[in-house]
């Protein structure tokens, strides 16, 4: 369906009490405006015109990669004025969809319904029934059809009783919309050019106005302050959780789950409370994610258990692995099948081979570890000399004793043993035992220091 979209995003957002433009505040880890842009892109919008004003430099920096035409509204003179700034870009015969950068949950299904409902030469208008319509423009009907919209400040006491409200979202043909916008005036309580006045202009020309309701009322709720943003966050997360439950993912507490990206799950996955998913995450079959974990841009294969409070970012984890609790896998970390990392272990840009283990208090950076190797508690790969990074290579069936420092670049061949407390600076041959401790001394009669009085 051929259409273009105008997204109004010029408002300052005073009630957010922030130096950041309102539409850049995030919902589910993504700027509100980007939610709307992504929905339009997914529907195949030919053009997306983003009308901006306050914080323009910040807007353009944050959304630099988005496929939008930037339209400046230098003075905020109302919604009609905002849309009119983009009107020179409208094609006369295309459908033009008007959306809002601070209404992030509008769904593709609702937009499709609205586009389909537009009468020839007329307007399709998204309206919603509200028990408490305070602050919203009211829909005025005459013997059924919509004939006008009256803003809250312009409404009579009788009109204020109307529960059908304007969402501001509409579809009109480009040529008609340009003509109606050109005829707007600002003779109202706000001294602004209201987009809503195009409804009366269309009616005066005998054009039909078709009202459409959203699939869910929450879709058309806007954000003016942080409390409203928090409400939409929870509503969005609830919808995400419901979809995952319907797909067979066991969320132990759907109310305490946050999806801030994309999640693909195999069969019989289980996710405990307070887990946060960011970026693109893939879970295989029978994966268990413990409470309080954060997963970002990672892949976790079948039958792996991630114990509570682990952080995995930019990493790949094989089958039958165990991670955590309190493990951090940083970008470039790779765990091969049946490997294990435990509490307070950090892995960065390192590969842990099949069947290998680092169960306690360890840092593995810029390292390659073979199969069936055991890394003792307190082991550190010393990969950085203050200027450059160096690699540690550890072979198969190696045993590294506790509290060892492996000063890279260094290679430990298959079957070698590193004694506890070793500071290793030279390569180790296959099967060798290395111990670098000083000779043990015993001092009899030694007295501990005492505090001076």
UniProtKB/Swiss-Prot annotation:
Q: What is its EC number?
A: 2.7.7.23, 2.3.1.157
Q: Which SUPFAM superfamilies match?
A: Nucleotide-diphospho-sugar transferases, Trimeric LpxA-like enzymes
- State the needed cofactors, names only: Mg(2+)
Q: What does the entry's cofactor note say about binding and number?
A: Binds 1 Mg(2+) ion per subunit.
GO function term, MF aspect, one: glucosamine-1-phosphate N-acetyltransferase activity
Q: What pathway does the annotation place this protein in? A: Nucleotide-sugar biosynthesis; UDP-N-acetyl-alpha-D-glucosamine biosynthesis; N-acetyl-alpha-D-glucosamine 1-phosphate from alpha-D-glucosamine 6-phosphate (route II): step 2/2; Nucleotide-sugar biosynthesis; UDP-N-acetyl-alpha-D-glucosamine biosynthesis; UDP-N-acetyl-alpha-D-glucosamine from N-acetyl-alpha-D-glucosamine 1-phosphate: step 1/1; Bacterial outer membrane biogenesis; LPS lipid A biosynthesis
Annotated residues that bind acetyl-CoA are located at: 377, 383-384, 402, 420, 437
Q: Where is this region: Pyrophosphorylase?
A: 1-226
Q: Which residues bind Mg(2+)?
A: 102, 224
User: What's a BP term from Gene Ontology annotated to this protein?
Assistant: cell morphogenesis
Residue span of region Linker: 227-247
Q: Catalyses which reaction?
A: alpha-D-glucosamine 1-phosphate + acetyl-CoA = N-acetyl-alpha-D-glucosamine 1-phosphate + CoA + H(+); N-acetyl-alpha-D-glucosamine 1-phosphate + UTP + H(+) = UDP-N-acetyl-alpha-D-glucosamine + diphosphate
| Main location class | cytoplasm
Where in this protein does the record put region N-acetyltransferase?
A: 248-453
State where UDP-N-acetyl-alpha-D-glucosamine binds.
8-11, 22, 73, 78-79, 100-102, 137, 151, 166, 224, 330, 348, 363, 374
Quote the cellular component terms of the Gene Ontology held in the record.
Answer: cytoplasm; membrane
Gene3D superfamilies (UniProt xref)? Hexapeptide repeat proteins, Spore Coat Polysaccharide Biosynthesis Protein SpsA, Chain A
The subcellular location is: Cytoplasm
Pfam families (alphabetical)? Hexapep (PF00132), NTP_transf_3 (PF12804)
- Residues forming the catalytic site: 360
List keywords of the entry alphabetically: Acyltransferase, Cell shape, Cell wall biogenesis/degradation, Cytoplasm, Magnesium, Metal-binding, Multifunctional enzyme, Nucleotidyltransferase, Peptidoglycan synthesis, Repeat, Transferase
| Annotated function | Catalyzes the last two sequential reactions in the de novo biosynthetic pathway for UDP-N-acetylglucosamine (UDP-GlcNAc). The C-terminal domain catalyzes the transfer of acetyl group from acetyl coenzyme A to glucosamine-1-phosphate (GlcN-1-P) to produce N-acetylglucosamine-1-phosphate (GlcNAc-1-P), which is converted into UDP-GlcNAc by the transfer of uridine 5-monophosphate (from uridine 5-triphosphate), a reaction catalyzed by the N-terminal domain.
Question: Which NCBIfam families did the record assign?
Answer: glmU (TIGR01173), PRK09451.1 (NF006986)
SUBUNIT field: Homotrimer.
Q: Which family does it belong to?
A: In the N-terminal section; belongs to the N-acetylglucosamine-1-phosphate uridyltransferase family.
Designated name of the protein: Bifunctional protein GlmU
Q: Which organism is it from?
A: Vibrio campbellii (strain ATCC BAA-1116)
Lineage runs:
Bacteria, Pseudomonadati, Pseudomonadota, Gammaproteobacteria, Vibrionales
